[in-house]
């Protein structure tokens, strides 16, 4: 009788044991962007043992961590004279990782209209702003507790009547 009771108690335990490892479809951290060999530069290297990067708000207490700050980015953009022939309004955000050496990679772009609804504004304009952002040199590496880190940064271009009217943040 003891053996029968033991078997009755052990069967549910054995049935509920997992033999497979559950794999999450979600990134290890909210907002984490995984490397995509189809989109990303294979020469871009992340630093440290972590596969994730800190969010942009960890990087700088005083604005954009760029040599010459946001004003220098604005000046560079004005020299490029990037504009659309269409009268479009909205936002183009380019998000990327800055590694511990100040190099950039893993770029992603999102476009939305002035009501924050995802929409392609103007392919030529968005391609120009994407390339402009990728070519920016002068990102400042940052540290947390004396350790150099990788971090996300983003630039959002506010578009009014086909022209960049503001760079956020």
Region locations from a protein language model:
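Sec-dependent N-terminal signal peptides
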Residues: 4-14
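Positively charged n-region of N-terminal signal peptides that target proteins for export
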Residues: 1-4, 18
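Charge-biased low-complexity segments
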Residues: 18-169
């Amino acid at each position: 009788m003891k053996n029968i009771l033991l078997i009755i108690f052990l069967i549910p335990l054995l049935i509920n044991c997992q033999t497979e490892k559950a794999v999450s479809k979600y990134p290890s951290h909210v907002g984490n962007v995984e490397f995509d060999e189809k989109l990303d530069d294979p020469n871009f290297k992340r630093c440290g043992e972590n596969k994730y990067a800190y969010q942009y708000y960890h990087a700088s207490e005083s604005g954009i961590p760029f040599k010459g700050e946001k004003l220098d980015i604005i000046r560079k953009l004005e020299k490029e004279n990037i504009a659309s022939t269409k009268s479009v309004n909205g936002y183009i955000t380019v998000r990327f990782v800055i590694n511990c050496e100040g190099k950039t990679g893993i770029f992603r772009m999102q476009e939305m209209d002035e009501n924050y609804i995802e929409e392609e504004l103007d392919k030529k304009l968005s391609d120009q702003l994407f390339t402009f952002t990728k070519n920016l040199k002068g990102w400042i590496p940052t540290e947390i507790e004396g350790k150099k880190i990788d971090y996300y940064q983003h630039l959002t271009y506010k578009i009014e009547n086909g022209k960049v009217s503001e760079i956020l943040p």
